[in-house]
Amino acid sequence: MTVLNGMEPLAGDMTVVIAGITDSPVGYAGVDGDEQWATEIRRLTRLRGATVLAHNYQLPAIQDIADYVGDSLALSRIAAEVPEETIVFCGVHFMAETAKILSPNKTVLIPDQRAGCSLADSITPDELCAWKDEHPGAAVVSYVNTTAEVKALTDICCTSSNAVDVVESIDPSREVLFCPDQFLGAHVRRVTGRKNVYVWMGECHVHAGINGDELVDQARANPDAELFVHPECGCSTSALYLAGEGAFPPDRVKILSTGGMLTAARQTQYRKILVATEVGMLYQLRRAAPEIDFRAVNDRASCKYMKMITPGALLRCLVEGTDEVHVDSEIAAAGRRSVQRMIEIGLPGGGE
């Protein structure tokens, strides 16, 4: 096992570079993601026997240097499969926790442990326990965008692409408590038609901020475009309304996870696509299909927590071996069961 201890010697004049890193509440600054930085990151990664994973919403420089880029669940499964015993997870904290849950014997690092998630924080273990007490016997279905403690109290996890399948796998007569995303939960209720699905009123502040008016305006201004909408978006209902009212062709309105967006982008015949999700996703979409004009429905939809994983944070992480992610063994075992139950029903799909 590769153990990350202490300061690792730096190449060339990178000592000066790391000395210039400044800390602030919004992340580690002072380092440019240039070729010198990239060369040093690759060297340190090899030296430490590490694999760097980056979420689709990360800064372009972080995505470019990563060994793998994807959604949180796909990356966590990769973490469990790769031979390297040190995982550097460039994402928000619950994602690194999920990687640790699925790889309990590996060292998992996150470049900045302060990178939280408004959606994961929207339900606490105590709140979930109280909700379960109000609905004895109900099945708890939790989105993978939850903390380890919430996963441990969950019967079965789901992703944005398989949430409907997961809920439909549960006895129709049994109540379902769906948490924490209200918009994904509303999507599940709408598609399944189940009235006994109760939805927690949590949200991702970035996706919730992509509103229906913006989407309607963009759709009407670009009648020749296809529309990709993430189910966490507050505008997902507006997208379906546009299709239902005939204002936008139904076959051009797609409610998709980030992984689903990449697949659809590679297969579409349209040359313009409006995208309703965190703006970091456009970088991966443009790489996957450079001939398509991808446009953000809201170009201000940027997650400040995702962007805390800066070039300086990643360099610091590999030099100092920080910040390591720990999950209590009993919580990890219970959380792992809820994820495995999801995988066992098939179609695990994309994490977000």
From Swiss-Prot:
One of its GO terms (cellular component) is cytosol. It is an enzyme of class 2 (transferase). Its cofactor is [4Fe-4S] cluster. Catalyzes the condensation of iminoaspartate with dihydroxyacetone phosphate to form quinolinate. It catalyses: iminosuccinate + dihydroxyacetone phosphate = quinolinate + phosphate + 2 H2O + H(+). InterPro entries: NadA, NadA_sf, Quinolinate_synth_type2. The gene is nadA. This is Quinolinate synthase. Belongs to the quinolinate synthase family. Type 2 subfamily. NCBIfam families: nadA, PRK09375.1-2, PRK09375.1-4. Pathway: Cofactor biosynthesis; NAD(+) biosynthesis; quinolinate from iminoaspartate: step 1/1. It is found in: Cytoplasm. GO terms for molecular function: 4 iron, 4 sulfur cluster binding; metal ion binding; quinolinate synthetase A activity.
